[in-house]
Amino acid sequence: MNKSRVRKTVVPAFCFCLLTAVAADETGAALFIEAGETSGLDFVHFNGMSGELYLPEIMGAGVAVFDFDRDGDLDIYLLQGHMIGPGKTLGEAILPPKKGAVLTDRLYRNDTAPGKSRLRFTDVTKKSGITAGGYGMGVTTGDINNDGWTDLYISNFGHNQLWLNNGDGTFKDITDKAGVDDPRWSVSAAFVDIDLDGWLDLYVGNYVAYDMGNPKPCRSATTARDYCGPQAFAPLTDRLFLNRGDGSFEDISEKSGITGVFGGALGVVAADFDGDHWPDIYVANDGMANQLWINQKDGTFEDTAPLAGVSVNRYGMPEASMGVAAADFDGDGDEDLFMTHLVRETNTLYVNDGTGWFDDKTAETGLGVASLPYSSFGTAWLDIDNDGWLDLLSVNGAVTLFESHEPTDRVFPLDRRNQLFANDHGKAFIEISDLAGDAFKLSAVSRGAAIGDIDNDGDIDILISNNSGPARLLVNQVGTRNAWLGISILDAAGKSHITGSKVALIRVTGQPLWRRVHTDGSYGSASDPRILFGLGGNRGPQTVEVSWPGGERERWSGLASNRYHALRRGSGIRVGE
C-alpha cells in the first residue's frame, strides 16, 4: 500500500480530533497556558554576554522540577549565569540583568493551596542555603543517601556542585567530601544505579575544553564573526562516579571503560536498552558519534552504538546532538531514543527492536522535515491528552548569528519557536504546535525542558528555560478530559523513588503500557519521577506490574483511576515465582 496515501487519510482525521478538543474548551484556552508570571515564578536568565561571542553564553541552561520538601507537589530549580570573560563587569553586559537581581541559581517552593487551581511559587533560595554561583548549565536530581530527600547535582561551566538535602528545607554543599567535583565544562548528568546495589551512582557528561583566557575567533559563511562550533575545541572525557553508600563516591571513569571513547557530551540518559534488566547509558555528543554504553554487569561498559545503529544517522553521518529522551513511544515494551540536533540536520528517532538494536525511523514517522529549520535542545516524551500515547516536545533556539532568517540589528537574534508533536498510535507524528496555545507561538532562545504534574491534577505540565529570558511554565488544559493513573514507585521504607524501575499498565485488550522511573534526559534538565498513565475513557480500577532493577516483578490490582498511588517494594504480589 502506498504510504503517502495512508498519511493523507490518517493525519487529517487525527488533527480534526485535536481541533475539536481545543474548540470545546469553554475558557478559550488551547492545550497549554503560560502560568509563570502569575504564579510568582519571576526568574530571568542572564547569560553575561559582552560582545565577545563566548561559546558558553549561548549554551545554558537547564531546569528541574522535583519535590524537595516532600509535601507532595513539585518545586522548581533554575540555573543562572553571570558575567563571563576575564575582567568583565556588569557594566559591559549587552543584555544587563534586572536591577537588584541576584545572579545565582534559584529554588522556588510550590506553595499552591490544596484544591486551588492558581499556582503559587515562593523563592526560598536564601532559606535553603544553596549558594550556587557558578555559570550554570545543568541540574540532576536523585536521592544519593536513601533518606527519602531529593538531592541536587549542579553541572557548570567550571566546578560542579553536589547539594545534599538536609530534610528541613535546607541543603549542604558536600561536593568535596563526596569527591564528585569536575572543574571542566559539564552540561548533562544522570543518577543511575549501575551495579544494582541500591545506591545511585553518577554519570557526568562533559563538553569541550574552552579556554576563556584565549578564546578562538570564528566566522560564519558570510565571513562575519560568529559563535564557534564544538569542532573548534577538543572534546572532554565523561566521568562515572560509584556511590560507596557512605556519602562519598569513587571515580571509576577509567576502569569502567567510558574514557576510551568520547566526544563533546550534551545529553545523557540511562535506561535498560537491551532488555537484560541492567541500566545502560546513552550519551548524545555535539558533532561527533554518540555512545551507547551497555552495562557488562561487572562495573564496566561497552560502547555498542556503532553496531546498534545509534552512533550516527541513517546516512552514516554524526550529528550535532543536543538533547535526548528515552521512552517506549510505540507501545512494544522497549526504550526508543529521540535526539535533538542542529539547524539543517533533522532531529532523529531511533526505534528499538527490543534487544538493543535500533533503526533510524525519523523520515517514516514525519519527524524529519519539521525539524530542519531549527536548532533544538531540550526534549521530552509526554502524553499531552492522556490517551495512552506519548507525544513529543522539542524546544528550540539558534546557536549562531548566521542562523537569523532575516537581517536584523538585534544583538541576540537566536530566538525560535518551540514545537509539539502528537503521536498517531506509534506510527507517525503530527506537529500540533499551532494548537498548543500562545506559548508555542512565542519565540525564545529555549534550552532546558522538564516535565511533571506541577498542579497535581493528573496531566503533564512543562517547564522551559530560556537563555537570556524568563522561564516559561506551561500548564496543561486538556489532559484531565481523559482518565489517568499516577504512580510513585518507592523503596520498602516508602521513602525514595527507585530509579530504573519499569511499570506496566496491564490492559484487558492490547499490549501493556510501559513507563520508566527516571528524572534524566532532555538537555541539562530533570523531570518528575512519578509515573503518569493516560487511560483514555477507561475510568475503572487498574492493574500495574512493576519490574524492579534486576528483574524481580510485583503486581498491584484494584488501583482507583484519577488519583496518585504510592507503591512500596515488597507490598505487591510477587510475579513469576
Give, region by region, the residue ranges found by the protein language model.
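Hydrophobic beta-strand segments that make up the repeating blades of beta-propeller
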Residues: 76-80, 147-156, 202-206, 276, ...
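Asp-box/WD-like beta-propeller blade repeats and closely related beta-sheet repeat scaffolds
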Residues: 124-141, 149, 155-194, 204-231, ...
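Beta-propeller blade repeat segments, especially FG-GAP/WD-type strand-to-loop junctions
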Residues: 24-34, 84-124, 159-174, 216-219, ...
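Repeat-based blade/solenoid architectures
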Residues: 41-62, 101-103, 128-140, 179-190, ...
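Beta-propeller blade termini
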Residues: 60-70, 109-110, 135-150, 162-164, ...
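Gly/Ser/Thr/Pro-enriched helix-cap/hinge segments flanking short amphipathic alpha-helices
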Residues: 24-31, 49, 53, 367-372, ...
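Bacterial N-terminal signal peptides
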Residues: 11-21
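Beta-propeller domains
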Residues: 244-246, 255-426, 433-437, 442-447
